[in-house]
């Protein structure tokens, strides 16, 4: 496994999972979804209502817990290639974000943050776009 893939896995894994368990369980993105909604001044209910209204065809179950790690990795790589972002740039961005988050949360007495948000930031993509990409890959529309 190359260092980029390892760093990506460790970033996803940074809070709450041991790597041996990650391969057996699906990654839960609830904290990321809450953070994204808060960033835009809305609630999770509003988010799902918006998705239904716009016919994005992403169910609540898919958004929260139906994203196995291999699918997440494929989506990250697909977006990275499409946007022509180097693995080095993503790695560097994740490292800088980790440092910034740790400084902020250490001052609050906690480091409970969504590490997945750092990957979205590094790819410069919002959660909805990421979920749509996952669905396209899952349905075989994108390799």
Explain the meaning of each model-derived region.
Residues 41-59, 124-143:
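Short C-terminal boundary/hinge segments that cap the last helix of small helical domains
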Residues 1-17, 54-83:
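A short, Lys/Arg-rich alpha-helix, primarily the initiator
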Residues 3-29, 84-103:
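Short alpha-helical DNA-recognition segment
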Residues 38, 52, 81, 95, ...:
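Residue-level detection of the helix-turn-helix DNA-binding "recognition helix"
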Residues 17, 28-31, 42, 74, ...:
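Residue-level signal for the short linker/turn that defines the boundary of a DNA-recognition helix
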Residues 25-39, 108-121:
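Short, basic-rich loop-to-helix N-cap that marks the start of a DNA-contacting helix
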């Amino acid at each position: 496994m190359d260092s980029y893939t390892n760093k990506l896995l460790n970033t996803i894994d940074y809070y709450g999972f041991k790597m041996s368990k990650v391969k057996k369980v699906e990654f839960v993105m609830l904290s990321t979804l809450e953070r994204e909604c808060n960033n835009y001044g809305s609630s999770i209910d509003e988010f799902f209502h918006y998705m239904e209204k716009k016919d994005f065809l992403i169910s609540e179950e898919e958004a929260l817990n139906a994203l196995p790690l291999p699918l997440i990795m494929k989506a990250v790589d697909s977006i990275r290639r499409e946007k022509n972002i180097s693995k080095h740039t993503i790695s560097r961005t994740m490292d800088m974000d980790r440092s910034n988050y740790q400084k902020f949360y250490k001052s609050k007495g906690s480091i409970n943050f969504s590490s997945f948000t750092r990957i979205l930031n590094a790819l410069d993509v919002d959660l909805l776009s990421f979920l749509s990409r996952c669905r396209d890959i899952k349905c075989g529309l994108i390799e």
